[in-house]
A protein has these predicted regions:
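Cytosolic nucleotide-utilizing catalytic cores of signal-transduction proteins
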Residues: 3-199
Length: 199
C-alpha cells in the first residue's frame, strides 16, 4: 500500500475486515468457503507498491496456525531465522531414501512425521514451511526412482497446487502421508499383478 496517511489507510483495513465477516456469514449456505486476506506494509512512495504486494503474498504464506477467515498483516517477526537445511538435513533426507529403497512405507511415514515435528515450532514462518515441504516432496519423488507409476502419481505440480489449498499445518502433513500411502498401495498392487500373470 502507498503510504499517504495511516488515518487514510485505516478505513480500508476496516472494510477488509468487514468483508471477512460477511464471507464468514455465508458459511451456513456455502460451508466450503474460506478466506484469508494478506496485507503488506505501507510504503512512502508508489515504487513500494510491488514490495507491498510481495509482503501481502508472504503474509498469506504465514497462514498455517492462524484461525480461518483471518486478516493477516505482514510482519518481519514471522521470520524464524531457520533455514530448510536446519530442519531437513542431509541425514534425514538419506534416511527417507533408504526406507523408500527398502519399500518400507511405515518407516518412511515415521520420518515424514519427524520432519513435521521438527518444523512445527516454526509453522508461523510460511516461507520456511513452503521450502521444507517442497524439499520433502522432491525427496519422496526421487525415492520413487524404482517406480515409474509412482513418479507419475506423485507430481510436483499437484503438490504445489494442493499446498495452496491447505490452510492447516497438521492437515498438510496428514495429507502428504495419506497420498504417499496411496501411491505405495498402487505400486504394490502393480507388482502383485505382474507376479500373478502367467509366464
Amino acid at each position: 500500500m502507498y503510504k499517504r496517511q495511516d488515518k487514510e489507510i485505516e478505513p480500508v483495513r476496516k472494510k477488509l475486515k468487514h468483508l471477512i465477516v460477511n464471507v464468514s456469514n455465508l458459511k451456513t449456505v456455502f460451508p466450503d468457503i474460506r478466506i484469508r486476506i494478506g496485507q503488506g506494509n505501507t510504503h512512502s512512495s508508489y515504487m513500494g507498491i510491488t514490495d507491498s504486494f510481495r509482503e501481502a503474498e508472504l503474509a498469506i504464506m504465514n497462514r498455517m496456525g492462524e484461525n480461518e477467515d483471518t486478516y493477516i498483516c505482514y510482519s518481519e517477526d514471522s521470520k524464524s531465522g531457520k533455514t530448510k537445511e536446519e530442519i531437513f538435513d542431509s541425514g534425514l533426507r538419506n534416511e527417507i531414501l533408504t526406507y523408500q529403497e527398502r519399500m518400507d512405507i511405515e518407516g518412511t511415514l515415521r520420518l515424514v512425521d519427524k520432519v513435521g515435528e521438527k518444523l512445527k515450532p516454526f509453522k508461523y514462518d510460511g516461507k520456511l514451511v513452503y521450502e521444507v515441504f517442497g524439499e520433502l516432496v522432491e525427496t519422496l519423488r526421487f525415492g520413487m526412482k524404482y517406480s515409474r507409476e509412482g513418479r507419475n502419481l506423485f507430481l510436483i505440480e499437484d503438490y504445489k497446487k494442493q499446498y495452496r489449498r491447505i490452510w492447516d499445518y497438521d492437515e498438510l502433513f496428514q495429507w502428504i502421508k495419506s497420498d504417499l500411502s496411496r501411491v505405495h498401495q498402487v505400486y504394490m498392487k502393480n507388482i502383485q499383478d505382474e507376479e500373478s500373470k502367467p509366464i
